[in-house]
UniProtKB/Swiss-Prot annotation:
Protein name listed in UniProt: Mu-theraphotoxin-Hhn2f
Keywords: Amidation, Disulfide bond, Ion channel impairing toxin, Knottin, Neurotoxin, Presynaptic neurotoxin, Secreted, Signal, Toxin, Voltage-gated sodium channel impairing toxin
Source organism per UniProt: Cyriopagopus hainanus
Modified residues (Leucine amide): L81
Domain of life, per lineage: Eukaryota
Cystine connections: C50-C65, C57-C70, C64-C77
Quaternary structure annotation from Swiss-Prot or TrEMBL: Monomer.
Gene Ontology CC entries for this record: extracellular region; host cell presynaptic membrane
InterPro entries: Huwentoxin-1, Huwentoxin_CS1
GO molecular function: ion channel inhibitor activity; sodium channel regulator activity; toxin activity
Leader peptide range in chain numbering: 1-21
Keyword Signal recorded: yes
Tissue specificity as recorded in UniProt: Expressed by the venom gland.
Domain notes for this protein: The presence of a 'disulfide through disulfide knot' structurally defines this protein as a knottin.
Amino acid sequence: MKASMFLALAGLVLLFVVGYASESEEKEFPIELLSKIFAVDVFKGEERGCRGFGDSCTPGKNECCPNHACSNKHKWCKVYLGK
């Protein structure tokens, strides 16, 4: 009984959101709605200034992230263990 009530309520909420979104003329409405619901801006990508584990690199340049080092043999960043 509780599960069916929850399912019915979730269906009504979904129907309301879809109906409201179809009336909206803005193309970015779903992204704006989700960012307001979760109060985070996860839809904008961020560029990292360094290269992480397994990324290609050039030995001698400081391209890898902290605690990583560029392997002279394989030419990719790997974890630096301090040896």
